[in-house]
Amino acid sequence: MSLRVPPRWVFAAPASAFLAAISLAGCVESTSEIAPGVDSAQFVRREDANMAGATMAIISIEGAPQELSGQFRQSLDKAAAERQIAVAPPASAQYLIRGYLNASPVENGARVDFVWDVFTPDKRRVQRLTDAMLVQGAGDDAWAMVNDAALNGIAAKCADDLAAYLSNTPEAAPAAALSYAQ
């Protein structure tokens, strides 16, 4: 009696399924406690940071309907100023930011996910920040649930995330930390 060896694809299929499940595991988050994504390190804003040292320019924000995009950008600019984030023209900024927003309906409202890719001027991505907020409401159109108050809250959370990251960059090191080098 001879033993038949199964084809190689029999072993490859479960391995591929396992790898796909592992790579998607970071995409599943609970709506009751929204945790940061796998690629997003948790940063705590340094209170002693020199925020003027880490300049940024927002290059683009994609995903929101056009009528909300302008409002969101204004809210984000205001929230960034309140957090002393130094905004500069793209040609002179130390960090270039690309944002992505996505809203999807969930039970009792909408979930708005946001992703910020942080690049150096030579277009090398140095960080991806991900976060999400829940918006209360009803209906099938998740973006229709995002009112002015929700939009301002999302912009404030985005500014908090960006400020926390930027405050931990070398350019934002407090002056006292740099005095030893002089």
Predicted regions and their residues:
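C-terminal/domain-edge helix-coil "capping" segments
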Residues: 28-44, 135-182
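Envelope-exposed proteins and targeting segments
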Residues: 52-54, 81-83, 93-97, 110-114, ...
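Bacterial N-terminal signal peptides that target proteins for export
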Residues: 2-16
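Post-signal-peptide N-terminal segment of Sec-exported extracytoplasmic proteins
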Residues: 45-83
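Amphipathic beta-strand/beta-sheet edge segments enriched in Tyr/Trp
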Residues: 105-138
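C-terminal motif of bacterial Sec signal peptides marking the signal peptidase cleavage site
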Residues: 22-26
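Solvent-exposed, acidic/flexible segments
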Residues: 65-73, 105-109, 144-155
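A short, hydrophobic beta-strand-centered structural micro-motif
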Residues: 87-105
